Amino acid sequence: MNAARVLSRLTRKPLDTPIAAVMRPCEIRAFVELVKLKQGSTDNVVLIGIDCYGAYSNTDYSRITASSKGAESTLAFYRSVLSGNGTAAEGTDISVACKSCEHPAAPNADITIGLFGTNMEESLLFLPNTEKGGQILHVLGLSEKADEPAGRQRVIAELVSERVAYRDRMFESTAAVVSDVDKLMSYLGNCVNCYNCRVACPVCYCRECVFTTDVFDHEPFQYFRWAKRKGMIKMPTDTVFYHLTRMAHMSTACIGCGQCSNACPNGVPVMELFRTVAHAVQSAFNYSAGASFEEDPPLSVFQEREFSEVTGGKD
């Protein structure tokens, strides 16, 4: 589960007890979107981000750690990465979502635990990104560890460049296999309407989803009518419509964490489809989901002049 969902539950109402939340960059970005959607608050919360080299899928991680303790596997992973041996372990690499993530650091956290460009065996880097974060590091006596080492930004830039190249190849290949309705239906063919992707999505926050209401609780005769009209009918129905609806609702807020694919029992590559669409939508609005608490979500504001290619440039 993306930790933003958990933090949202804890902060929807005022807190008397302060919370320190240690989160990956994608989780912080998801929480940023939830705060802007009034589904959480940063009051009495300290966001601690950690540089992220990526994560395995749930099933891969369970298999890799089955023969060892989780902490040992985590340390082995970081030693492998920091020694230049990559992220693969036992023939398994990090998830596609992580390979295509261009936000491996968390500048929107109060405090960043820096791993890029550091020797983790010798020390940890603590970077204050906000006044709140700086005050906490000062109280803890960690202010002297807040100097960014030379080469850190170069390491981050190289990793981002590698991931952006992978991401763009993913966009291209995904767009090719969903370029028409028939291809999209085939792409989503294994979907069984379990709605796990909706439940796992950190920014899908509706208390009641239209797809679990009577709107899609069709009468038996309707199925036979549709089958007679078309000559056949695929069961379960509305699978493509469900994903199209989710994309319409969530594409401006998708942060590409990959939990949708993680939760799918049938291996539908949901993340690849949603990220491809979300990237196009967010680019159209010049918006990056989760990048800033101050930037309003695109559909929450009105611009007098935008999309001139649609309006013909008319005022």
Give the positions of each predicted feature.
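Ferredoxin-type iron-sulfur electron-transfer modules in oxidoreductases and energy-metabolism complexes
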Residues: R163-G189, C206-D315
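Local cysteine-cluster metal-coordination motifs and their immediate loop/turn environment
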Residues: R24-R29, D93-A105, G189-V210, S251-G267
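Iron-sulfur-associated redox domains of electron-transfer enzymes in respiratory
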Residues: M1-L184
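Alpha-helix boundary/capping residues
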Residues: V35-K38, C191, A280
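Short secondary-structure junctions and interdomain/linker hinges
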Residues: K38, A105-N108, C194-V199, A284, ...
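Generic hydrophobic/packing signal
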Residues: L47, T59, N193-N196, V203, ...
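Internal hydrophobic scaffold segments of catalytic domains
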Residues: E122-E131, L137-L140, C194-V215
